[in-house]
């Protein structure tokens, strides 16, 4: 087996700050998005809730892209519970049920050490298999805000993306400023103490991916946008050689003018791939709006597309399959 796709699920209380995350129809529903995303990959629709996760405007979860790529290329998917409110109702590896706290009030992840340790054990077991490459995606509502906080703590002048075309950058910065004040630190102050940056401002997805990457010593594709930049920056600060890593995301993240994906990836020193999906001709507004900056990435959409392309399919094939899956969803309503 050449490649294994891991989907790491995480929750953080930050997703319930009004206006921060649109990875769910309401702030409260963002708590269920990770498990619903995982369930949708294996079933016609999620089991925990009866609908697929959508933004408040009704745009479908990027899990639809991952599912489309998987239906084409048939790569194996393993779900990893990094730290969520609920367990997904699909087979999964349990790392923790610790949820990231609201970092304005307290350190985000006191359990980071246990999570890294367990995830590293899991990575070490995967290292004993013939798998040559892990492609690691994530579903973590609120995760672009924790990512930006971690990147700032490590000294990167980064702006992270958002699943909304109106990136709530000023709200993110206000929330992060409050967190830095609580922790008594300034930008860049934790560049030599990455684990403290993770403890203070991170989320369980980051800790899980770091642990897996420390245990599995072959090639790793970090399948995500700006959230995986935070993971890369933490790995680099921990002394990892980034030459065995790459980030796979979508063109919607790479082209996001409100964020600094390309610049920050360069600054960290990690190569990236941006899946050239195109929904502009879709018959569904929910998909066409991806081209207007809605949703952009998540659930390893870019990495799943990359696996499909490696298996001989084109980004157009993936886009067509997404259209078909979305039609199936509409017919089920």
From Swiss-Prot:
Q: Out of the domains of life, which is the source?
A: Archaea
Q: Name one GO molecular function term.
A: nicotinate-nucleotide-dimethylbenzimidazole phosphoribosyltransferase activity
Query: Mind telling me what this protein is named?
Result: UPF0284 protein TGAM_0534
The record ties this protein, via SUPFAM superfamilies, to: Nicotinate mononucleotide:5,6-dimethylbenzimidazole phosphoribosyltransferase (CobT) (SSF52733)
CDD domains found in the cross-reference section: DMB-PRT_CobT
**What is the annotated signal peptide range for this record?**
none
Which InterPro entries does this UniProt record tie to the protein? Nict_dMeBzImd_PRibTrfase (IPR003200), Nict_dMeBzImd_PRibTrfase_arc (IPR002805), Nict_dMeBzImd_PRibTrfase_sf (IPR036087)
What's the family?
Answer: Belongs to the UPF0284 family.
Q: Which organism is it from?
A: Thermococcus gammatolerans (strain DSM 15229 / JCM 11827 / EJ3)
> One Pfam family this chain carries?
DBI_PRT
